């Protein structure tokens, strides 16, 4: 805020932050009983917050503050995802070391968090590059290895030549296969790598997605697709090569089509393909220079190998084809051109036979020479299996073909955690010529990083003194593993460390973690759907199987926040020059304005464009609230007799009800809208000469409480102006002091009536109304409406079947016909006495809008012609002039 009304946002925000800190407002004691656990994905230590950070952390701070005011103990911690290649690169560029650079970044970001007033329990701060943290990465590695979930193998890995490190499959992005960090095209390289066997949990990771009711559907679908379970069969084909026969297993989901397999295909890096390349220059040329798995058309080359179709006994040619991938299925497949689009295209380009072995059920005919028939159907040209459905054929063929068996394949691959960089957790293994790879004993952990060495390639390889050590098993010379762990290991369990950050004999206190976990609300970007979120689920399940946790899922509810876009509606970026500095906004308008703007602009999961006008509007709203708080008498009593005061009091109660519902749903934008409308009403009502100061004071107090989770500094200042006890941050969340169950109906009645008055004034061209009469319908019409609600189709007959209504003659009959025409969407009218009372309470709104007195009359108090126009829920209106 600016300097108006004595509000120096900089001084006041710093003062309240100091007071919260001095009072330990946000600390949760270790003996808390299952506190509400609210967590935002901890930030990478870049040193600078952007507006996306502000939004992300404002979301959880608002929720945590609301939960605390609503009576919960709340765990809302913060830490630092501080390992990783960017820090190493920054250190190289600045001729420093990654630790110094990272610590400087953490200090800067902590200052920015504190300036924004985020309420964290800083006593629980964790930093992943701290040896006291990463020793437990190493301890968990040993535990996983002892459980058979870690293996080392030579593997073709994704290699980023720019970062000079291995990437997990999840870190290779898009069809162009670019590095997730630097957008460099990724290549392949064979290296000895350490893997976590995530595939051992593939079924559970997939099946338990159905239980993640609090997760967005798109994230669950992304994980399902990434795990990619496919049910099928593995069937052996005997391949005949010049140097001998070999059985090769092919995986297929369509074993029912095996009689139509007219060729066999191998991946370019399959051992038999590599052997064929050594014998044949054409095959070698294809493998080395032509094969393109990402090409638009399938390509291949015939080899000197043939295969025996186990269903027909026929010899079929074997091709090396670029559409066969070694890491999908078995790296070998039977090709059925008549029933697969890719195989069909390949067969046409290589003049291979195309045979139909499945036909549609019924009389439909297809020509597989023109296009493949890819649906299930009835087997034809399949010998003894003719006439079986595809499903029956698959079952029978699996039973009958020697060596065939049902199988499941996954797209999910084991998680390669080895990284050839310095700034990460050293993998706790030493390599001994006699003993092989040996785990570093737990009592020797942590294996700390040596001093940083400026070098190309892996700096740990250059740390000679650190690298050479003794074997823990035999005492002989050994060499440390020089790879470090993927930084996603750090973030796969950090939420557990927050429960006991200073524990020095275990990664976390098991009893407390079982009490406080899972995280109740987790907030972060959707880009982590198949990396961090999947790995965290894997870790949690493994820890449960190691008897360290009672639960098997880490996050009860997940919110993926949308982006803050530039004013031009595109993603903020330095290159576009459309970014907004949080520090500048905080300096110019204050932290509360920044927080309020990012939370009122849209639902947390939606994108929205930055708006300077929206910032100014948010700032003005806070200034208006503070002026109200400073201008009311907090000790004023409420006059229950005044209808206008009662209207305002009911609106305040309804706002409490609505805002609470919106906070529960994390619809902060709608909560702010409700409070904004209430504040506008209070300002308008306060301008009346007969305004009840007690009602205004109660409304302002409620507004301050309802807005406190979002704009805490301004609300603390307002709370102090209201002589509130303690901090508003610790005040009790308000509850409605009146029954608001009918508020939607009363609001519709009031707004509809006000709109009708406006229409009459505009249509009649009345410049200066001198009075307004609002006439409610006669009571018999309300009776007729209630009877019509219970009518079973015959509205007129049911209504006129009532003796009292029959005595109303044509008036009742005409109204019954009107109701019949509206059925079943009958008016949702209040009972007559409540309708009149509602209109009497709201009359002041019309009076203040038109500067004219308003009378609310019953039908028998008004002119007959006017009263005859009234219906339940739609009073008759007459505007006087002159």
Residue ranges with predicted function:
Residues 728-882:
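C-terminal low-complexity, glycine/proline- and small-hydrophobic-enriched intrinsically disordered tails
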Residues 348-350, 354, 579-649, 819, ...:
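Catalytic adenosine-cofactor/nucleotide-binding cores of aminoacyl-tRNA synthetases and other
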Residues 199, 305-328, 467-606:
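Alpha-helical recognition segments enriched in aromatics with Gly/Pro capping
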Residues 19, 23, 27-103, 124-140, ...:
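N-terminal catalytic cores of NTP/NDP-binding nucleotidyl/phosphoryl-transfer enzymes
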Residues 1-51, 193, 203-206, 217-228, ...:
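Non-catalytic terminal extensions that flank enzyme cores
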Residues 22, 95-248, 332-444, 459, ...:
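Residue patterns forming the tRNA-binding/recognition surfaces of aminoacyl-tRNA synthetases
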Residues 60-61, 70-73, 267-361, 366, ...:
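Catalytic alpha/beta core of large soluble enzyme barrels
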